[in-house]
Amino acid sequence: MFIFLLCATIAAAGCSSNVNSAGSKGNNDQAKSSVNGSSNASEQAHSIEAGTQELIVAGQEIAVTLDPVQPLTTAYLRNMGVAEALFKVNAAGEVIPELAESATAIDPTTWEIKLRSNALFWSGKAVDAEAVIASLERSRELDLQAQPFLEGMTFSAIKDDTLKVETEREHLPVPLNLSYYQTAIHNAEAKHDSVETMDMTGMYKVVQFVPKQKIVLSINENYWGEKPSIATVVHEEIADEQTRVMSILSGRSHIALNVNPSSLAQFEHNDKAAIIAAPAANTQTIYLNLNQSQLADVKVRQALSWGLDREELVVLGAEGQSVPITTWLSSNPAYAEAANAVYTKFDADKAGELLDEAGWLKDSDGLRYKDGNPLTLRLMTWGGDKALGEALQNQWNNLGIKAEVQHGDYSLIETARETGDWDATIEAWSTFGDEYALLSGQYAPEARGNFGGFNDEATNQLLAQLAGAADAEAKRKLALQINEHVAEQAPVISLFPRPQLTAISQSLHGFEVHFRQFENTITSRLTLDAQ
């Protein structure tokens, strides 16, 4: 069974100068889309008492650690209802308060944020201004992924329940920047190295953690907000795609995350589970290591992009569940006009000409050589990108490139990046949010997402202009200019928005469809049928 729901079009990086919980609640409720009926437990005649309910989520992977500043951790904790930020983005793309109660822009470079008076860490420690500042500063210091969203902000406590945020840039969308999972609020005084020492604020507490296997959660009885009705959540790591699919089709699990498009056919005539497809503002991207000699040449990088048939890649790598794009930012609906910029069509002839100009000439064996050495490219893939990697390998081979693909665990990619022994990898980062934070986080010389070492003077100058842009139209114009210029330089190759497919059991009710599904799976609205 299939359920395809479209979220409202997302406004780019927008938030009003006043954000408050009372004023946002009504719009938020109207914006939410739910699947399988009402999410109100009192209206579910078939619901059972919370004390006996257990929800099982099958994921491709679980959090690697319990420390929110470590890689591959906070997104999973927030997705499971463990971690919270000051703000969050609802399904309509609106920024609403979470641990904050309200936010007010005092002047172009100053915000005041009032905190919820009843919010506590699991330990019972108050979520006051000093604790929030300590958390954000710890994230700034230790989490490279958080730094673009905290850059240029200075925090100070006005009162126990109020903090001031001063910004270097005028009109910085502070609530939006503080809605990202990388800014999750945690007790900075805690060690976060075990179930016993971690200290978060979410509606679910971690009670068991077995790395690479499962995380078990129970209700936080002191939660400040609406408590969930399901007593226990188990997030299991099932790396194998088919095993994960069979887990939900058999009824063993209630949610299966990151379903590969190749598995869609198994749900067509199934009455046990449904596939939810939410539009995602992210871009399936090939990151190139510019420290490798063959990839240091911009003509080679441009050839790699011109020589890709993206329509075929969507079919082979995403089962047709996406659309081709040629620039990174264009997966954000607000920048969809740039979807076909620079690389306007698949052009193998142009790719060949560029490789010829770069000195890589075809030999009788069909491969391209320069100074007696073949043009090689090693692509590392992980997760559900195996078929995509093989399709890319075939298309590049047709250009005379000796392409190889290594598919494995993400840790292999991390290790290769640490040693520098890699040519290309695939990632899909979100393109929704403040344009400067997003683009600088990818293309500034020391940015966390700048895996390949891109350092381009023109890009750096444009980023500096974007940082100082005062009005929305100027920001938009500069963002489009940076987006197109980077595509021309080709340190990365944009392919298509990564399909965001989630399978949910027909016994689960109140599931919210969200364009940022990766951090909005578990909510207090979920209920289960009696068994």
Protein language model regions, located:
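Aromatic- and charge-enriched surface segment that lines or borders ligand/interaction sites
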Residues: E101-D143, Q294-A296
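Surface-exposed binding/hinge segments that line
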Residues: T104-P108, Q147-E189
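Ligand-site clamp/hinge motif
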Residues: H192, N220-Q266, Q393, I401-E404, ...
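Ligand/substrate-recognition segments at binding pockets and active sites
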Residues: L361-T431
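Gly/Pro-rich hinge or "lid" segments in bacterial periplasmic/extracellular proteins
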Residues: E94, E170, L176-P228, T232, ...
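Structural transition elements
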Residues: P324-D363, D385
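Detector for C-terminal structural segments
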Residues: V210, G307-E337, G384-Q393, E414-Q531
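N-terminal lobe/hinge region of extracytoplasmic solute-binding protein
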Residues: A58-D107, E137, D199-M200
